[in-house]
Structures are given as C-alpha cells and as structure tokens.
C-alpha cells in the first residue's frame, strides 16, 4: 500500500469513489476520516452493495452507508491488551470462521497508522503501514546523490 489515500475517504466521497479505492487496496474496506484524518467510520464493499440494493445511487455520500463503530486497535496497546480486545469471537462475528477482519491501528489522535488483518483464530496475518503524504519538504544544499534520491522518493 503506497499511502493512506488508498484506505481512507472523506464522509462526502461518493460510493463510487469508495468502491474505486476498495478495488485498489484489495482489503474490501475503506475508512472514513475527517479533515484531520481522525477515524469516523468504515465502509466495506458489502455495505456499498447493500446500500445500492436499498436504492442508494453510486453518486451518494459514503457517510450514508458507513459503520460508525468499526473494530479498532491502538498502537499504544501491548499484545495482552490487543488480545483482550480483538478476540477470535469478535473476528468471527464480523467475518465468520474463514475470513479475515481488517482493523485500523490508531494513534492517540485516532488517526490511522497501519492496517492489520486478523484471522478467525484472532491471529494477525498481515500489517500494512499507512504513510502520510508529504506536504512540504525543505532541502538544504549539499544533499548529494543520496539526498536527492530520497527527496524524489518523498515527493513522488
């Protein structure tokens, strides 16, 4: 996953926009965030499908189908606290025995720092870091080849 743009949408993004991001990130989910990147909710491809079947148009806002209380974890949690909150029964409740639950890991400001997948046994099977896009880069002379390559990577 290149950056958080593939896993987050604003509440006003359209259902079509959300489906496009879900198609790219292949998690089956996007997370709804406010203007400060704080988590507001989550939308799965199933939420969108059910919304369309209920008569929603793909041009409607994603907030109309978003779940406002998704399962989350915090980066400050240790393994014991994680295991107390993300139990196999919680995972199975959301995705059954054979599925994986995609969970945003939040910082203390409720911003997504990574996304993990947990299986029906409650075991973490993958983690993807969420890299914030760079808004400003200050380059001071003498960066050399390596510095210029790093800047290109940051700005790319």
What are these model-predicted stretches?
Residues 2, 131-134:
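Short helix-loop-beta connector
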Residues 1-3, 15-36, 40-67:
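Soluble cytosolic regulatory domains appended to membrane proteins
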Residues 71-74, 148:
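Conserved ATP-binding/catalytic motifs of P-loop helicase motor domains
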Residues 140-155:
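N-terminal Rossmann NAD(P)H-binding glycine-rich loop of SDR-like oxidoreductase domains
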Residues 8-27, 33, 52, 56, ...:
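The conserved cystathionine-beta-synthase
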Residues 5-6, 15, 78-79, 123-130:
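Short glycine/proline-centered loop/turn elements that form peptide/ligand docking sites
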Residues 24, 31, 38-54, 99, ...:
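Short beta->alpha transition motifs characteristic of CBS
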